[in-house]
A protein has these predicted regions:
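ATP-binding/phosphotransfer module of carbohydrate and carboxylate kinases, centering on a glycine-rich
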Residues: 1-44, 50-54, 59-125, 191, ...
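Short helix-capping/turn signature of helix-turn-helix
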Residues: 8-9, 187, 201
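General beta-strand structural signal in soluble alpha/beta enzymes
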Residues: 43-44, 170-175, 208
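Short, active-site-adjacent cap segments at secondary-structure transitions
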Residues: 49, 137-140, 178-181, 205, ...
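Short, acidic, Ser/Thr-enriched surface-loop or helix-capping motifs
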Residues: 83, 140, 209
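Glycine-rich phosphate-binding loop and adjoining helix at the ATP-binding site
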Residues: 88-194, 335-346
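Glycine-rich phosphate-binding loop of actin/hexokinase-like ATP-binding domains
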Residues: 191-249, 397, 401
Length: 407
């Protein structure tokens, strides 16, 4: 696909594009001309001379199309608008939807999306859709959550169809960790064809990308690394399993441990009745990075458990890179990165065959939201290219019918 090759290269000449795509130079010239006529591709100067005439460079036109990404969390929500290259151009955040019934929660998200689009001043006709990145389990095709979190009312609620109905835009539901992984790939955070992503917000999840595509499993609920069993005699988890890694390493677990260490909990002003998990965890993470020994001990313990998750992922999929993403990991990124890297170095099965590097997300707390928008773009590039090279020019600017939920 020509558009995707241009996107991946950032800037590329027609000759290079023909070589990388396997399409003849004559066909590339024709396709590029049509893509330029539709405003999707622009010329951006010339490359360095290699002895002959410098080659004209191409890139995607960032302002040709846009996509919205939403991190839909119990304690925090983030909305981003990205251009055709996946670069964020506008952002907003607000408290999560945990206290609200589903209808009100979705309506709140829709109002914030509309407000962001109005503030950004983009032509809504250029907005391809919305990627809704959230926790699971979920039925991605139906656009519904299959969990009683945060309340039983949310189970089976048509989150994506309802949001699409309000916005009048296609809405794609996907796992937050999977979205974060593909977002990192698109933004060039990793230079390897296969890598894993460990994502931590209020819970822990994972995503694996192979050759630019997400590993989906049978129902797109795979790589739930927070629900691997790390203690056969451990307590019950909300997922129905016992001894899950999340019970020992996620923000709720860390907060519980801090409260049990009464001097630390009191010193940080932690309240057992506080439902804002992200804010409470953020206080512990900030204290750990500031050198508080008790707080650092808790964060390092959580990080060692995530190291087990990273070792499991690398051994299962033979990965050479693990990305740490999500708002909770961003809060104490250097500590988590250092500890997880050491665990992987010591324990990965193929450590004598190749090193495994652990890096932090380039998108920080917004990784899942940006990834949600990227998933929309990823699904649309082929549609845009087909429409541009087979349709009359009058159709330019009209988004094609797309997969996903729409009104």
């Amino acid at each position: 696909m020509v558009l995707n090759h241009i996107r991946a290269a950032r800037t590329i000449s027609r000759i290079e594009l023909a070589a990388e795509s396997g399409v003849t130079p004559a066909t590339i010239t024709q396709v590029v001309r049509e893509l330029m006529d539709h405003g999707l591709v622009v010329e951006v100067g010339r490359g360095a001379s290699t002895g002959g005439k410098p080659r004209t460079l191409l890139q995607l036109n960032p302002r040709a199309r846009y996509a919205v990404g939403v991190l839909f969390e119990r304690n925090t929500c983030v909305v981003v608008l990205v251009d055709l290259t996946g670069r964020p151009v506008a952002r907003t955040s607000f408290p999560g939807t945990a206290p609200l019934p589903p209808g009100q929660g979705v309506a709140l998200v829709a109002s914030r999306v509309n407000a962001l689009l109005d503030t950004a001043g983009v032509d809504r006709g250029k907005v391809l859709g919305v990627g809704l990145a959230t926790y699971g389990p979920q039925d991605r095709r139906a656009g519904v959550l299959l969990t009683h979190q945060p309340t039983p009312e949310w189970f089976g609620y048509p989150v994506a169809p309802r949001l699409s109905e309000i916005l009048g835009l296609p809405v794609l539901l996907d796992n937050d960790a999977a979205a974060a992984a593909i977002g990192e790939y698109w933004l060039g955070a990793v230079d390897t064809p296969a890598f894993g992503c460990i994502y931590m917000a209020s819970g822990i999840g994972g995503g694996v990308v192979v050759d630019g595509e997400l590993y989906r499993g049978s129902s797109s609920n795979g790589v739930e690394i927070g629900h691997i069993t790390v203690d056969l005699d451990g307590g019950p988890c909300g997922c129905g399993n016992y001894g899950c890694l999340g019970n020992y390493a996620d923000p709720t677990a860390v907060i519980k441990q801090a409260l049990e260490a009464s001097p630390l909990g009191a010193r940080l002003g932690l309240d057992p009745g506080d439902t804002d998990v992200m804010a409470a965890f953020g206080r512990i993470a900030t204290a750990a990075q500031a050198g508080d020994p008790a707080a650092r001990t808790l964060i390092e313990r959580s990080a060692r458990h995530l190291g087990t998750a990273a070792v499991t992922m690398t051994s299962l999929f033979d990965l050479d890179t693990i990305v740490l993403a999500g708002p909770s990991l961003a809060a104490a990124g250097p500590i988590y990165q250092s500890v997880v890297q050491e665990e992987v170095r010591r324990r990965t099965f193929a450590r004598r065959a190749h090193p495994v590097r652990v890096v932090t997300s380039v998108s920080g707390s917004d990784a899942a939201a940006i990834g949600g928008a990227v998933l929309v773009l990823q699904g649309e590039l082929a549609v845009l290219e087909l429409a541009s090279t087979t349709s009359p020019r009058e159709s330019a600017g009209k988004p094609a019918e797309r997969a996903g939920h729409r009104r």
